[in-house]
Amino acid sequence: MLEFMDYVQFAFYNATKWNYENSYSQLTATAKGLLDFETPGGLRFNLSSLSSPNFATSYALGSVGLVDGSLSYLYSSLPLRTTAQSAKIDLHEIIRGYRQIQELRRVDEPWMLEQWHGGRRIDKRDTLLYGRLYLPQSTLEALYLRRITPTQQVRITAVSDSRLRNGGTILALHQYDTGKYSTETLYSTDGGLLGLRGLYNFGPDPRKEVTEPPKQMPRIDDKFYGRFSAGAELYYGTLNKSGGVSVGGRFATLPAHRGIPLTATLTLNPLMGNISSTYAVRAGKNLSLCSRLDFNVYSYESDLVLGCELWKMRAPVEERRERSMEAKLAWRLDEVDLEKEKKPEEVAGVLKARVDQNLKVGLVWEGRVKELLFTLGTSIDMKRRDQPFRALGLELQYSS
């Protein structure tokens, strides 16, 4: 489950119309959401608030062996009109599971963001500032996020910690997204790392408008609607004189597909000899399955992980209505309004489970009780019969 500050940052992306999923770093996001979920350890409580559309605060207190916590503050120059109450937040927005790839949209033109007053431009670039202080470690995290143009964004993150080399590190990232393709250029002070990422989407170009009317063709209900994306990553450490490269591809069905939604990825690291393949499918309305196989061509070592996600919905409660006076006088029942809109199903909870080839199991139950969001999870090692439970934790979140 996302923390409140991460939820607010995604709200900033949506408000500025930035497609954070159109990136090579998000190529395997679906498999990570289904297989790499964190199991809480100990007891942790988060208290957050979006006190104004531009300012948010969050306080966390945990107990894992010793008492620790954190203080977080966030400022956005763009007012964020998003649901902040934990009792009303849509669980689909904070619980990361199977993610349906959406259709590519056309990026706004630069002139669409211009605002003029008295012959002068008064529009400003949308900016987000975020800081978090961990106690008692006195570790400080900071984030600077700024939209430059509709297709460009700058993201700078910094960590200050006495335990790190040189007392901290800074990571600068420049993102460029046209919809059809995206690139990312990064630099990190940790080892003088330079990197370049790119992702290309095959198929129609959202930047080109369709001027000719589509030809009349017979409808084919079983047509396969999907999109194939391919990308690569290249990085080099200027201090340690070492580098790396990876390539990958993804095929995912689109919302227009009438069949079972699925996502398949294949990534390759030729220098290390690692090959990773994932396959995720939404087997039912509330059930998703996923598998991942990692293989090294040099050592012949492999790793297999299986996972599932099950959404449990609350049973609808029918409203009891008394018969109208007109129906009583006519000795009949009221007519049933078949056109009445049905209320959306309410989520009771989400169960996530994974198991690897070493029989290590992870279980997480996430949901909402009254006005509290909760995450209950455990890690189990089936090979250790004496102490199978490795960790057990509960995390609570309240926001207003």
From Swiss-Prot:
Cited PANTHER family: MITOCHONDRIAL DISTRIBUTION AND MORPHOLOGY PROTEIN 10 (PTHR28035:SF1)
Topology of this chain in the membrane: Multi-pass membrane protein
Native organism taxonomy: Eukaryota, Fungi, Dikarya, Ascomycota, Pezizomycotina
Pfam families: MDM10
InterPro entries named in the record: Mdm10, Porin_dom_sf
Protein encoded by which gene: mdm10
Residue stretches in coiled coil: none
Protein name per UniProt: Mitochondrial distribution and morphology protein 10
Protein species of origin: Sclerotinia sclerotiorum (strain ATCC 18683 / 1980 / Ss-1) (White mold)
Complex and partners: Component of the ER-mitochondria encounter structure (ERMES) or MDM complex, composed of mmm1, mdm10, mdm12 and mdm34. Associates with the mitochondrial outer membrane sorting assembly machinery SAM(core) complex.
